Amino acid sequence: MAGFSFAKKFTHKKHGKTPSDASISDQSREASLSTPPNEKFFTKQETPQKGRQFSQGYHSNVNKTSSPPMFARKQVSESRIQPSAVPPQQRNVSGPSTTLHKQLSKQREYTVWNRIKLQNSPFPRYRHVASAYVTDKNQIYVIGGLHDQSVYGDTWILTAFDNATRFSTTTIDISEATPPPRVGHAAVLCGNAFVVFGGDTHKVNKEGLMDDDIYLLNINSYKWTVPAPVGPRPLGRYGHKISIIATTQMKTKLYVFGGQFDDTYFNDLAVYDLSSFRRPDSHWEFLKPRTFTPPPITNFTMISYDSKLWVFGGDTLQGLVNDVFMYDPAINDWFIIDTTGEKPPPVQEHATVVYNDLMCVVGGKDEHDAYLNSVYFLNLKSRKWFKLPVFTAGIPQGRSGHSLTLLKNDKILIMGGDKFDYARVEEYDLHTSDIDMQRGTIVYTLDLARIKDLCPGVMDVPTDTPTPRNGNLDLATPVTPTSHQTKNMNVPISAAPLASAPSPAPKDFSDADRLNREVHNRNVSTEHQNQSHPVNSESHLIAEPNILTPYVPSESSQTPVMKITSNKPFDTPTIQKEPDLSETMDPTVGNQRIPSSIYGDNLTPANQIKNNSPILETLPSNEIKTPQNGNIEEIKHLPDADEKIDSTTTFDQEINGDKLGTSSMSKVEEDGNVADEDDEIGVAQMASSPSKDQFKIKHYNESSELSQNNTEIDKLSEPVDITIKKSDTAGHDSANHVIDASDEKNVSPMGDVPTDTKNEEASVPINRDATTEVVDRALFEKLRSELQSLKELTHEKALEAGAHIKELETELWQLKSQKNSGTTKEIDELDSVRLQSKCEILEADNHSLEDKVNELEELVNSKFLDIENLNEVIQFQNEKIKSLELEPNYKEKLEELQIEHENLSRENERLKNESKQHNEDIINNVANYSSQLGSLISHWKENRANSSFLESSSSLISVSDENGEKTVGEPYGDQSRHHRVVINKLTNRLDDLLERSQELTISKEKLSSEYHALKMEHSSLSQDVLVKENEIKKIQNDYKESISSMDSASKALMVSQRELEKYKSLNKKLIDELDELKFKNGVCSENFENGLRSTEESSNNVKNSNSIRENQFNIKINDLKAELFITNQERDDLKSEVLELKKRLLNLENNTKQVNEDADSDLL
């Protein structure tokens, strides 16, 4: 995930806040160890005691079969798509509270939304899975998801009460078979089994790739089962979807489509038979569609309806899409569905559910990462979109990664997503909060009971089939490549094969509608009701015959069997028609569009394996390659109108009520079957997309941009109206559709477009990139003349074919009349064989001529459409030229502005020079005045010594105190008036200079004082540093002395230990001697008792001698004990001294470190 940037990608990107998770009680939680450092997505893991399972890191002990060898294998430790971060302003925006029992009287407006508080809630969580509809027990199952960088693996059960106005929650105990924590997975409810596949998880298979197991939850016994299919499996992925289709009453198939793994997108389609999951030979089957495959896509939605798969929206390598793709398993092919009405914008991470005949699309994230809360409905029968009107009361916030569940009372339950939706404390306050207040979360319900009134026509069922555009076209018509671009569609689709697609014949959907309503609204199956006993093990699972048996549509709702009538060059499937079905079908039939060649031919299954490019060419080439039976056949374009076109396809058709070609049909069908057997399995197209912004946005539906009414176009020249009368034998389809390569580059055939679509497209301007080439009038006239010649040739061929057919019919009538008239003339065997051969040859020629007529007619029609497109292009170019001519001449204005700018620049330079010269003159004058003033001052100083001058000047000068000016007496007033002015100016200047000098002096003194202060501080710091260094040296010396003392103490201790050993050995020796003496003393006493007794004196002497010896030994023993005690005390003292020295050493080291740190901090 990124994920998911899901590294989207997820580089998938969290909310930025970490609110406490209060979805279950605190007693059921406990924190676990953090994830390994190489894991990017699961950055937080928790394992509760019960009810909730979190990611526990990667496990390698998984045994699974290998994936298909075509896929590239990536390490799990690669970057993942992370879910996009939610802007803070979008989290706590909440609408007004809605329906509660005490607030019903306060509501004045109708709303389809309702909010419900869910206590003990599993939410918030993002990109989880939930069952699409409730069971007969009103239960909903929720598994996995992501919240606040925690990936969940718990399984919750929500039970609805009181008409879905109240819910209760329980959890399922975690077992060994429980799926590990995952996000971005897919699930579907099938009978009494809840099927889960894929997702971004830490579990890997034996090859180190992402988990590719299928997990089945028995919703009765709550036991998990993991099938073990043999052979290749779909690669583990996230952002995909799974769905089921019941083929028979006891057979259900699981389909997996799309998804991504990091930057690799998938478009493979795999199917697994759920009915055989217990068999040892169960396996995955990889489907290869016949003609067309959607682009690699992820984060889309897929539903099952009418035994078909319907895909909407999603993210491709080129951007988001809003198209509807449909897969029909009966013919094994994909189709692009042409829809009308108010189409949703391109969106991803939205949610979809089926309600009756409607596909409901809620929320999602658009191409600008804006979160949507809009609701759209697609009528799957009329193929028309409807948008739910906006009801502001109770509407949920825009969101993505949420889930939808269809309830029994025509309501849709919306749960989870990337919004917190925490409930508030007050009981009737249904506003949401971005802070967990321990009151659970808010879930939303959408009431569809009045959907017919809110969206008129949403439930309408079409009564007739769409009118075909061209009567000469049959069920399959090749589509011409086009290079036009459409502005209103902002997403291209990856390349796909240039091929035609059939449109299914109209059929009755009444039984299918009834069954779908029963499945999605009532959801009670006969087999499901019969299950009452619990299942506690997998053996019990095997005993249940209907674990994977959903409702089976009746035969009337099944798609009719499609028969292959040709295997080259397009391998186009057709529908076997009834005898009265004479109308031919348009490529756009039943709002089901044939894929345009703008998909390109690189998505054909054969090229998918070989092509490693992430972006496939979308422009048409001059050669169209189509794989058949392992070979590539080239279809050359028609260079000349008179060149013959070989017919390669024959169709089962009617001529005057007689069916032809039954034997040839069966032969062609056998060839088609052989081709299918030789084809290899389908694989996904994978491509790395480091940045999708670099791709230019295009779209496949580009030809409809220029489709407008002919009366609204001012054509430069009217094309010739070519109409060819269809004979009774018309009704065949052409096999090939070939046009000139020169025309193929710029134009494409136009199909009938619904009125709404026409009106919308007519208002959209044509992209200028598609009309940059100017069409020459000579080429236009050439094409016109060529069309005229083709018309004449076609008419001639048609007349020849009609005449030939009439001749054959005449001969046949004559033969029948001869036979009926009872003629006795007998025809020999050789003549009959020749006649039969000639008839077959003529029939073949007739068919060939009819095919050529149809091909030429289609070519003529396409040429007319091309001319119409060219005419529109020319008209658009002329209008553009006129609009450009009417625009003002900006070049002349620019030149005038440039000239004016140059003039102003020259004037500016001149003014600058004048200003510079004026400044220089002022400076020179000031210098002259200064020199004159200096000479004047020197002269005044010389005359100052003269006393008479001073006395006379003192009598004449008076000081005016009021104005501060000096007034000079009249005798010298006239002579010194000008000098006084100069002197006053110079005096003022001198005062200013003195003031500045004083200020400079003061600042200098301040700086000098600061300098001295800093110098003193530096000297004091230097002294402190020296003192610290001396202390450090002293400490180092003490440390060295302590080390030496410790060494000496250790040496003394070693000496004492050696002496102690000596004492021990000596003590042992003395003990041995004492034992020996005791033994000898005992022997002597025994001998003395048993021997002859001597006199009492001799015995007394012996006793005295023994006692003396014993006393001596006792003294020695006591001395040794004393020495041993002293030695033990000395040893204990030495140990205490060593411990004290160690403590001192540690203290010294700590002090040294502290001093060093202080010194470093002082220096800094």
UniProtKB/Swiss-Prot annotation:
Modified residues (Phosphoserine): 20, 23, 25, 94, 503, 613, 689, 691, 717, 748, 837, 848, 958, 997, 1003, 1022
GO biological process, one term: regulation of vesicle-mediated transport
Gene3D superfamilies xrefs: Kelch-type beta propeller
Polar residues composition bias: residue spans: 20-37, 50-68, 78-102, 554-575
Keyword line: Coiled coil, Kelch repeat, Phosphoprotein, Repeat
GO CC annotation: cell cortex; cell cortex of cell tip; cellular bud neck; cellular bud tip; cytoplasm; Kelch-containing formin regulatory complex; mating projection tip; prospore membrane
Key word GTP-binding present: no
Name of the protein in its database record: Kelch repeat-containing protein 1
Family annotation (PANTHER family): KELCH REPEAT DOMAIN, MULTIPLE EPIDERMAL GROWTH FACTOR-LIKE DOMAINS PROTEIN 8
Coiled-coil residue spans: 777-931, 974-1163
Note: Present with 1350 molecules/cell in log phase SD medium.
A Pfam family that the UniProt record links to this protein: Kelch_KLHDC2_KLHL20_DRC7
Region Disordered, residue ranges: 1-106, 550-589
Gene: KEL1
InterPro entries per the UniProt record, alphabetical: Kelch-typ_b-propeller
Record function comment: Has a role in cell morphogenesis and cell fusion and may antagonize the PKC1 pathway.
Residue list for modification Phosphothreonine: T467, T477, T604, T626
Kelch repeat intervals: 139-186, 253-307, 308-357, 359-409, 411-460
Keyword Thylakoid included in the entry's annotation: no
